[in-house]
């Protein structure tokens, strides 16, 4: 593999399918998609392309046997609720939700239309499903990360920046994941000589003030736990970490791609393709109540070598060896 600024080279955008006329013998099916990110977000475009690629591999072609109506929430809760209502009003065969926030908006709108979600850390705690094995309602999908992954983030921070003795944890306390991941981090912290301080993620101004205040303490680091707010504000968070020379670990590979030091989390594109598989099964007659919620099967470690160099960090060979090569 050619190692450039990133240890992990992720696949590029997939070519969009050719639109053809529906054949008389085929029934046109309709899929609604509620994206959490904005339409001009490069990561969002790559993800929706992976989703459509997954559908194509299962025999679904836009304009021939399926129509896809995509709405872009742009990380805005009000906008997501509006588009959730609009999508539900069109009564598609199934709706694809791409984050906890969009899933919540859809669940508030409909309890009958089938929903397949990705990007939800604790669907049981959030009330979207009765259990992982038997969802029991109109929603199922693919969980994002387990709470224990929080401890892995802290381990990675300490490994890539051994001098860190104090870590601030960006989290959303309104989400079950915000509490669960923090608990896993705090349980590990004493054994590796790190003190922790949680910061609630709500808006950029609050994050900026908290990080600036925290950065005054020597040997500090940053752990960004899963939340839609962190994704929406990823570029300001990355910029703040760089301005204050804070080594930081993130839960999503797009953070490292955008300049963050290191990320560890599920292969998101793989989950989007898997979601296409569940939607295919629903379109063929299965119900979300009987399709178990699946945990991630593949995780990715991404290291931004340029950022590591700027922070004066030497990436350990053990981490380089764990980085995927494509």
Where are these regions (language model features)?
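Short hydrophobic alpha-helices and adjacent helix-cap/hinge residues
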Residues: 1-326
């Amino acid at each position: 593999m050619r190692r450039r600024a990133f240890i992990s080279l992720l696949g590029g955008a997939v070519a969009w399918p050719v639109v053809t006329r529906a054949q008389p013998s085929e029934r046109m099916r309709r899929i609604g998609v509620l994206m959490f990110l904005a339409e001009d977000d490069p990561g969002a475009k790559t993800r929706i392309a992976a989703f459509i690629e997954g559908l194509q591999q299962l025999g679904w072609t836009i304009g021939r046997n399926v129509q896809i109506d995509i709405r872009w929430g742009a990380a805005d809760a009000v906008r997501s609720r509006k588009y959730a209502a609009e999508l539900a009003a069109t009564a598609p065969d199934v709706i694809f939700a791409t984050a906890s926030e969009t899933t919540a908006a859809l669940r508030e709108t409909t309890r009958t239309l089938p929903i397949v979600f990705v990007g939800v850390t604790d669907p049981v705690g959030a009330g979207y499903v009765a259990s992982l094995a038997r969802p029991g309602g109109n929603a199922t999908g693919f969980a994002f990360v387990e709470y224990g992954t929080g401890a892995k983030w802290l381990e990675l921070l300490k490994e890539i920046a051994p001098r860190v003795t104090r870590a601030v944890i960006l989290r959303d306390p309104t989400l079950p994941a915000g509490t669960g991941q923090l608990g896993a981090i705090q349980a590990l912290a004493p054994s590796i000589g790190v003190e922790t301080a949680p910061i609630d993620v709500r808006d950029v101004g609050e994050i900026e003030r908290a990080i600036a205040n925290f950065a005054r303490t020597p040997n500090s680091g940053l752990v960004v736990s899963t939340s839609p707010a962190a994704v929406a504000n990823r570029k300001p968070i990355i910029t703040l970490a760089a301005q204050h020379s804070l080594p930081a670990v993130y839960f999503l590979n797009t953070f490292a791609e955008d300049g963050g030091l290191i990320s560890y989390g599920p292969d998101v594109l793989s989950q989007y393709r898997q979601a296409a598989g569940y939607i295919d099964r629903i379109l063929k007659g299965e119900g979300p109540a009987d399709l178990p919620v699946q945990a991630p099967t593949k995780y990715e470690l991404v290291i931004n070598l340029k950022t590591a160099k700027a922070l004066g960090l030497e990436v350990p060979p053990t981490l380089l060896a764990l980085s995927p090569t494509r």
